[in-house]
Amino acid sequence: MIVDNSKDFDLKSFLANLTTHSGVYRMLDKHGEIIYVGKAKNLKNRVNSYFSKGAKDSKTLMMVEQIARIEITITPSDYEAYLLENNLIKQHRPKYNILFKDDKSYPYLVISRDKFPRVSFYRGKSAYKKGQCFGPYVSISSVKNTLNTIQKIFPIRQCENSYYKSRVRPCLQYQIKRCLAPCVGLVSQQQYDEQLAILKKFLAGKFSTVLEEISAKMYQASEDMEYEKAQVYRDQLVVLRKLQQQQIVDIQEDKTFDVIGIYMQDSYASIALLQIQNGDVVADRHWSIDAKGQDKTSIMHAFLSHFYLGDEIRNIWPKNIILSKVEFADITDLMNSISQKIGQAINWIIAPAADNLKWLKLAEVNARQKLNIYTSSKSQYQKRLESLKEFLELEKDIKRIECFDISHFQGEATIASCVVYTDEGEDRKSHRRYNIKDIKAGDDYAAIYQAVSRRVSSGLEADNLPDVMIIDGGKGQIHQAEAVFREFGIQDKVQLVSLGKGVERISGKEKIYKGFDDTEYTLDEHNPGFLLLRQVRDSAHDHAIKGQRKKVSANRQSSIIEEIEGVGPKRRKALIMYFGGWQELSRASVDEIAKVKGISKKLAQEIWECFH
């Protein structure tokens, strides 16, 4: 139950009547924002401790001064309390909690839940919603290489469901023996599931088991005189043997473990997680945080809860977890909750012997190195922010910067990009692109006006306007943004600035204009504020170019067919649904093209001539 959600909050009465049950508590400020989330075995004792006379660190004292209301949720057990606490922290990201931000969103291989499943990859932890996950992989290139390897060995489909459902004949993948063509019923459910089961064992690292099973199936097929089937198994074995020579080994679960090292310096902390399989580091991940007022114990405790009680996906969980030496007041409760969450017992090693000590030292060295990089980069970035604030003569610190850039191809396929930087650095998840419509070809001014209008309109509605908005361009571009600002009345809410290369178009000699100020400014090319302006501008430019290229590519795909009189949208769709793509259409004969509904022999001849 949630307790006390009223504006007239009586702290003294609330503390006196608190329950002694386990649960989660939330501290809210006068604006109703959650500033801290905590978990307790005894809510009464834990919440009252914040208001007792005992010694407290400066961060806790600062937080207590801001508490305007407290809410609690009673849970049936400690386990549910841990899970709820973790979910609330991720949802609200309270400023006084220890917050972890993964250094990247890792890709996973996913086997879908379809009747004839497909294998594909997804980035991020939402992958588990798509099907059975394997990973995470350390990079996009590694997961793509694995997909390519899978396709050579296991004829499991990788196509999108929309493509799969539209097939009326096998695609090229079937012809080169990389798919069993379940789309047109050329394989039974049993045969497909058999290949799928072997693939899952392969992805789980059961390499020897896979070799044994395929060998047995090959010999059985040969004895049954099913020679084509035996040849398929033989071809699989050939590729697998080559992989074996490249040192792919079995994953032995008793030799699979995680190592977690922590390093602290000043008010910062870094955690390194090494994932070990058969004596090899298969993945290393890092988290660096601001940890003012925290100690190693509280940081490690928060990390274990964040990582192991969160939505991390692992097809093999470690049986051993090695930790930096820290003291836990309720380590047993946390360990039990983690074991319950992942469904197996874990051996926690806090003081490792010589065999495992080397791994812990390696993790701690990694944590230290990452923290040095993090603090150095953060310090440099803060200097740039402060320098830009000084140049723009702003009273408040800069918390959010947005930059707009326009890209088009010969006046067509116009894209506006908007990149976001916060006081923590680049915020890639907030980047976005705008498709620009209903303007004259190549009209950058109109494109800027449209993009900024759409952003300001949504920003006012969501109350998330930036502190600084940068426009890539000169006087003409910034005047368009100024017109939008006047229209919405936000001249005093957002600092507008533009960065253009000027007549000379020399990098480092850019001309700067402030909003509603026609003065032309220049800064030394080594000025920290100028470097930040260029950094953000270049990021926006790259983001725009990538979006524009995608749009041009999409527009070109059907341009060849569009030139043929008599082939409209319906017939183009029919052609794609029948052949599965332009490439396969280009290989088709006139007679094959004429089989498509609505395509006459004469029209089929014209289409064929387009590609030949």
UniProtKB/Swiss-Prot annotation:
The keyword Ion transport does not apply. One of its GO terms (biological process) is nucleotide-excision repair. Its main location: cytoplasm. It is found in: Cytoplasm. InterPro entries: GIY-YIG_endonuc, GIY-YIG_endonuc_sf, GIY-YIG_UvrC_Cho, RuvA_2-like, UVR_dom, UVR_dom_sf, UvrABC_protein_C, UvrC. GO terms for cellular component: cytoplasm; excinuclease repair complex. Residues 20-98 form the GIY-YIG domain. The keyword DNA damage applies. Residues 208-243 form the UVR domain. It comes from the Bacteria. Pfam families: GIY-YIG, HHH_5, UVR, UvrC_RNaseH, UvrC_RNaseH_dom. One of its GO terms (molecular function) is excinuclease ABC activity. Keywords: Cytoplasm, DNA damage, DNA excision, DNA repair, Excision nuclease, SOS response. HAMAP family: UvrC. NCBIfam families: uvrC. The UvrABC repair system catalyzes the recognition and processing of DNA lesions. UvrC both incises the 5' and 3' sides of the lesion. The N-terminal half is responsible for the 3' incision and the C-terminal half is responsible for the 5' incision. Belongs to the UvrC family. Interacts with UvrB in an incision complex. This is UvrABC system protein C. The lineage of its organism: Bacteria, Pseudomonadati, Pseudomonadota, Gammaproteobacteria, Thiotrichales.
